[in-house]
A protein has these predicted regions:
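Aromatic-anchored, glycine/proline-accented short structural segments
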Residues: 152-212
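N-terminal signal-anchor module of multipass membrane proteins
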Residues: 1-48
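Helix-coil boundary and interhelical linker segments in multi-pass alpha-helical membrane proteins
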Residues: 23-32, 83-94, 139-151, 199-209
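Structural signature of hydrophobic alpha-helical transmembrane segments
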Residues: 32-45, 90-104, 147-162, 208-214
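Juxtamembrane helix-loop boundaries in multi-pass membrane proteins
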Residues: 1-21, 55-80, 96, 112-139, ...
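Hydrophobic, membrane-facing alpha-helical anchors
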Residues: 1, 41-57, 99-116, 135, ...
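Long hydrophobic alpha-helical segments that form multi-pass transmembrane helix bundles
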Residues: 125-139, 143-164
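Membrane-proximal first intracellular loop
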Residues: 27-35, 49-66
Length: 214
């Protein structure tokens, strides 16, 4: 069993996130959406098994800046997974706060590991996943969360987007992305869509200056 879970790639979290998102988008096709959600849930559990039973190898994997930044999609997927759990409103709120706390802790871990000191060699488009990803929490935010908290999350992730675009583009100009990692260039199209979706879902009205910049 342990050998099996050690073979589960952390990159599976990105596929799981995509499947959860697709399930939410086609929820009017109930049977298909539920099937996709079930498939995504199986993938989510496989990653959990990898984290628990293959922890030592996970620690080694997270020394790679691409793997470490893309793995933040696991926390994004966790928000979508938890939103469909049969919990009371209080339980959903506690789970949401707990996941947000874990995500913030992971951001701190990543920042301490890869930004001290900051090196362009360590910067990749997948950094958007880690620093803009928390915006997905607004897609499943409980009604009990104050508007000020929602606005803070949207504002911080919006500013992170504005800061990361020039940094990532400068890195790509100065140092070419290795061929192995070129597929992650597709991530560049995701941050703005996520911010817009999050602002709509949470009924937030971002500051005009941020909207103009985006």
């Amino acid at each position: 069993m342990k050998v099996f879970f050690k073979k589960i790639p952390l990159a599976l979290s990105s596929l799981v996130l995509a499947l959860f998102s697709l399930s939410n988008q086609i929820n009017h096709y109930a049977l298909i959406a539920q099937g996709i959600w079930l498939l995504a849930s199986i993938g989510f559990m496989l990653i959990l098994g990898r984290l628990i039973l293959g922890f030592e190898q996970v620690r080694e994997d997270l020394r790679n800046p691409v793997i470490a930044s893309a793995f933040a999609s696991f926390f994004m997927a966790a928000f979508l997974f938890a939103s469909r759990l049969p919990l009371a409103q209080t339980g959903l709120s506690v789970t949401w706060v707990g996941l947000l706390g874990l995500y913030i802790a992971y951001i701190i871990f990543f920042s301490l590991r890869f930004m001290r000191p900051l090196s362009l060699n360590q910067v990749f488009p997948s950094w958007f996943v880690i620093y803009v990803g928390p915006a997905i929490s607004l897609v499943t935010v409980p009604a009990s969360v104050p508007t000020s908290i929602k606005g803070l999350i949207l504002g911080v992730t919006g500013l992170a987007t504005l800061a990361l675009f020039p940094l990532v583009l400068w890195r790509m100009k100065q140092i070419a992305i290795p061929h192995l990692y070129q597929p992650i260039l597709a991530i560049l199209a995701a941050p703005l869509a996520l911010l817009i979706t999050s602002s709509i879902k949470s009924n937030q009205r971002p500051a005009t200056i941020i909207l103009l910049a985006l």
